[in-house]
């Protein structure tokens, strides 16, 4: 799974076998799942 570090913003791949939840770039342990971009709904003009 790919996560995003909250401190430095780097993408981090996490090993589920070792269960190391830590950023490889800055060493931060606060990681969030990247959200998919919201789809904009088109509204027809009246």
From Swiss-Prot:
Gene3D superfamilies linked to this entry: RNA polymerase ii, chain L
GO cellular component: cytoplasm; DNA-directed RNA polymerase complex
EC number: 2.7.7.6
Co-factor(s): Zn(2+)
Principal EC category: transferase
The record's free-text note on cofactor binding: Binds 1 zinc ion.
Annotated Zn(2+) binding sites: 8, 23, 26
UniProt-listed GO biological process terms: DNA-templated transcription
InterPro entries: RNAP_P/RPABC4, RPABC4/Spt4, Rpo12
Keywords: Cytoplasm, DNA-directed RNA polymerase, Metal-binding, Nucleotidyltransferase, Transcription, Transferase, Zinc
SMART domains tied to this protein: RPOLCX (SM00659)
Pfam families recorded: Zn_ribbon_RPAB4
Cell location: Cytoplasm
Record's subunit section: Part of the RNA polymerase complex.
The family this protein is said to belong to: Belongs to the archaeal Rpo12/eukaryotic RPC10 RNA polymerase subunit family.
Function: DNA-dependent RNA polymerase (RNAP) catalyzes the transcription of DNA into RNA using the four ribonucleoside triphosphates as substrates.
Record's protein name: DNA-directed RNA polymerase subunit Rpo12
Organism: Archaeoglobus fulgidus (strain ATCC 49558 / DSM 4304 / JCM 9628 / NBRC 100126 / VC-16)
């Amino acid at each position: 799974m790919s996560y995003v570090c909250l401190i430095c913003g780097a993408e981090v791949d996490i090993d589920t076998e070792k269960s190391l939840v830590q950023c490889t770039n800055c060493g931060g342990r606060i990681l969030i799942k990247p959200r998919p971009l919201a789809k904009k709904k088109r509204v027809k003009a009246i």
